[in-house]
């Protein structure tokens, strides 16, 4: 009798995705982040639904309802802290996952990559509307500043802003709709994640060497299912440690003050995971230019597959591109630091240089480095012996 997991219509789908999935034998811990993101999404959905049972989306009671959750609901303080800090871990995993994709050339699976960029935008949107819900000072002013950016859209800008606000300022209607969006979007993210996996399983996973691994595949279970469990344990340990010992470490003190439209906080800034994009937005003096740069900072990822010039897929054997990649990582960290700083000298000029370098790396330096490495490879091959020349025809990976 055939195994039920291989014949049952529903179990067969799960089996092909999680049990008998052929995976390259050499994928490293950097390939853990996909499953960690699935764990993050699941944890955020569960904690979020429990919070929604006690939260009230009304400007008169929203702030009090969050305080009520932390004080009066059984383990409400834990659920709230796990949800707030879970968002930070979600973004840590996303940025590491994207970084892995850039380093190892996973972006050459164009459909999977582009759906991943859409997922990143959806998660950023969800986190933004979620940050507004506690209705503290930074929630209110963050919502005001970011939604106001839409007024830069020519001709329809002001109408668009008032349409999103549901009035002439950020008010009750805004909070109600943001709660509706924050509840709905994670389910859309879950659906798009299924698409992301569907396209990934059409091609199979990439690997650190960037080579076709069809000749050397092993089943996902038990090898990588157990390997992923170690990642789960490490992440959950880190998340619970943060949520239990320093739950407000990554938050903003201004958000412990109820929203007041008459008092502007001295420095309006988003959560730490948006600071790099916020720094790019602020580095351009023109409002419309800033909004376009903000969008471009994420959408530039969609251009990466088309700007791949190297004959090799991953950066494993490409030292020049490796240097540029780590320069990009350092640059994003500098932008994150600048995003949290006031708009004054020398932070303005540092932010502008870092923003210019950010786009230069993606649009100019990476393609040039790939082209240069091809030339160096050809030069090396032309001076090699006939036997060595046989291995001088690299493929961009399978």
From Swiss-Prot:
Q: Which cofactor does it need?
A: heme b
What residues form the membrane-spanning segments? 33-53, 77-98, 113-133, 178-198, 226-246, 288-308, 320-340, 347-367
Name the Gene3D superfamilies on file.
Answer: Cytochrome Bc1 Complex, Chain C (1.20.810.10)
Main localization of the protein described in the UniProt heading: mitochondrion
GO process annotations (BP): mitochondrial electron transport, ubiquinol to cytochrome c
Q: Which UniProt keywords apply?
A: Electron transport, Heme, Iron, Membrane, Metal-binding, Mitochondrion, Mitochondrion inner membrane, Respiratory chain, Transmembrane, Transmembrane helix, Transport, Ubiquinone
Q: Which family does it belong to?
A: Belongs to the cytochrome b family.
Q: How does it assemble?
A: The cytochrome bc1 complex contains 3 respiratory subunits (MT-CYB, CYC1 and UQCRFS1), 2 core proteins (UQCRC1 and UQCRC2) and probably 6 low-molecular weight proteins.
Question: Could you share any additional remarks the record makes about this protein?
Answer: Heme 1 (or BL or b562) is low-potential and absorbs at about 562 nm, and heme 2 (or BH or b566) is high-potential and absorbs at about 566 nm.
What is the protein name given in its UniProt record? Cytochrome b
Species of origin reads: Hypseleotris compressa
Coding gene?
Answer: mt-cyb
């Amino acid at each position: 009798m055939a195994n039920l997991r291989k014949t049952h219509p529903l179990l067969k789908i799960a089996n092909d995705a999680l049990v008998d999935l052929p995976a390259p034998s050499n994928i490293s811990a950097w390939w853990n982040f996909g499953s960690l993101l699935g764990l993050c999404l699941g944890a955020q959905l569960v904690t979020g639904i429990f919070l929604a049972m006690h939260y009230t989306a009304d400007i008169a009671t929203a702030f009090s309802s969050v305080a009520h959750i932390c004080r009066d609901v059984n383990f409400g303080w834990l659920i709230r802290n796990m949800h707030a800090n879970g968002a930070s871990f979600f973004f840590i995993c996303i940025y590491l996952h994207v970084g892995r994709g850039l380093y190892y050339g996973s972006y050459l699976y164009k459909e999977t990559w582009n759906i991943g960029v859409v997922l990143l935008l959806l998660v950023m949107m969800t986190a933004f509307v979620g940050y507004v819900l506690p209705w503290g000072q930074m929630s209110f002013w963050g919502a005001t500043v970011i939604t106001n950016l839409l007024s830069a859209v020519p001709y329809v800008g002001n109408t668009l802003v008032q349409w999103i606000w549901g009035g002439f300022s950020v008010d009750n209607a805004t909070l109600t709709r943001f709660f509706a969006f924050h509840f709905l979007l994670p389910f859309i993210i879950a659906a798009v994640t299924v698409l992301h996996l569907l396209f990934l399983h059409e091609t199979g996973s990439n690997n650190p060497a960037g080579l076709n691994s069809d000749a050397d595949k092993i089943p996902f279970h038990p090898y990588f299912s157990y390997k992923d469990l170690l990642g789960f344990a490490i992440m959950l340990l880190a998340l619970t440690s943060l949520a239990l010992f320093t739950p407000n470490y990554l938050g903003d003190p201004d958000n412990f003050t109820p929203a007041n439209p008459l008092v502007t906080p001295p420095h309006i800034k988003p959560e730490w995971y948006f600071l790099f994009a916020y720094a790019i937005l602020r580095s351009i003096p023109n409002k419309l230019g800033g909004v376009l740069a903000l969008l471009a900072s994420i959408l530039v990822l969609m251009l990466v597959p088309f700007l791949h010039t190297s004959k090799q897929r991953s950066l494993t054997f490409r030292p020049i591109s490796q240097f540029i990649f780590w320069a990009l990582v350092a640059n994003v960290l500098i932008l994150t630091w600048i995003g949290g700083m006031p708009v004054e000298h020398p932070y303005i000029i540092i932010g502008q240089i870092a923003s210019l370098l950010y786009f230069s790396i993606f649009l100019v330096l990476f393609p040039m480095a790939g082209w240069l490495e091809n030339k160096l490879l050809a030069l090396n091959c032309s001076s090699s012996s006939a036997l060595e020349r046989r291995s001088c025809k690299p493929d961009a990976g399978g």
